[in-house]
């Protein structure tokens, strides 16, 4: 469902009008009243049924897994940041995680949440990825952005920039490379993946003139990953790497921090990219955009990214059934 005051319900409903119902049985986790509110606004024609257990889900329908209303129906205020909406969004995510862990569902596709709203609701996590890691007790979770052959993963995620340098260490990079390599094989079906690693400093340190991290930390991490059988190259300067389309020579790119990876990714893929959490015991994807409160409830949201997230989750399910 996502934050019901954002564009989450809208993009899910729009995407559910385009999926292949012979391939998947969708279970929409949230409030039926929220679904009905936006379905009516969008003049949707979906066949809908309410369920209390995934065993009751039927093909050809949007099966709504009702959460309950905390004793009252939610008051929907499109565009507003509210704790009740944040709490409901996280409750839906938590339910989805549990259903996947119990193998009642095969994958989880999350709609956008508001980091501010979930904080107001008492959830002290910076985002989906960290919450998923906590709930599944996963120690090595990798945030990866995907658009067809463009795949960008991150060493650090939602940390302030001033803290990034202290978080870049050899073991962290090696662990990220291991998770990334395994995901490229098991989720994407790439038999012998090639990974590029970006530097931390401008011009990848320029031989130590603009920082030592490339020499002291990143290059040794790459060398050790190579010794473990992972094909990884670098560190490459972050600015020229994407500009020269060097990324097209690799199956994935490992960036050191959030904006280093996501600015070029979204420049090349905005509205079409997918956020994937590698390293979890479950499959989880999401669109690469946020709640977009400014256009919520106005039938202006583009569902392309959510649809891509749904279809990528379908691909991962099949790839895990038929490993390379």
Q: Where does each model-flagged region fall?
A:
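Contiguous, glycine/small-aliphatic-enriched amphipathic segments in soluble metabolic enzymes
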Residues: 1-128, 171-256, 260-266, 272-283, ...
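Glycine/threonine-rich beta-strand-loop-alpha-helix active-site module
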Residues: 120-142
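Ligand-binding beta-strand-loop-alpha-helix segment within the catalytic cores
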Residues: 145-174
């Amino acid at each position: 469902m996502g934050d019901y005051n954002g564009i989450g319900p809208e993009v899910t409903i729009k995407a559910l009008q385009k999926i292949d119902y012979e391939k998947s049985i969708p279970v929409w986790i949230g409030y039926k009243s929220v679904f009905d509110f936006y379905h009516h606004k969008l003049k949707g024609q979906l066949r809908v049924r309410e369920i209390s257990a995934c065993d009751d889900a039927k093909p050809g329908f949007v099966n709504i897994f009702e959460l309950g209303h905390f004793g009252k129906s939610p008051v929907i205020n499109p565009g507003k940041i509210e704790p009740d909406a944040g709490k409901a969004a996280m409750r839906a995510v938590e339910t989805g995680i549990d259903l996947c862990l119990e193998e009642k569902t095969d994958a989880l596709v999350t709609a956008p949440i508001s980091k501010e709203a979930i904080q107001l609701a008492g959830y002290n996590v910076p985002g989906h990825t960290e919450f998923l890691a906590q709930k599944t007790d996963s120690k090595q979770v990798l945030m990866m952005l995907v658009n067809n052959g463009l795949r960008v993963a991150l060493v650090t995620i939602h940390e302030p920039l001033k803290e990034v340098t202290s978080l870049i260490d050899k073991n962290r990079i090696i662990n990220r490379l291991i998770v990334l390599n395994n995901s490229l094989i098991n989720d994407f079906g790439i038999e012998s993946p090639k990974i590029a690693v970006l530097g931390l400093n401008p011009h990848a340190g320029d031989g130590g003139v603009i920082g030592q991290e490339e020499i002291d930390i990143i290059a040794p991490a790459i060398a050790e990953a190579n010794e473990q059988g992972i094909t990884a190259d670098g560190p490459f300067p972050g600015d020229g790497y994407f500009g020269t389309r060097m990324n097209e020579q690799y199956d994935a790119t490992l960036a050191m921090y959030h904006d280093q990876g996501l600015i070029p990714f979204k420049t090349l893929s905005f509205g079409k990219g997918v956020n994937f959490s590698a390293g979890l015991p479950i499959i989880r994807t999401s669109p690469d955009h946020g709640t977009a409160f400014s256009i919520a409830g106005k039938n202006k949201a583009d569902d392309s990214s959510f649809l891509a997230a749904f279809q990528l989750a379908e691909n991962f399910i099949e790839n895990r059934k038929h490993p390379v």
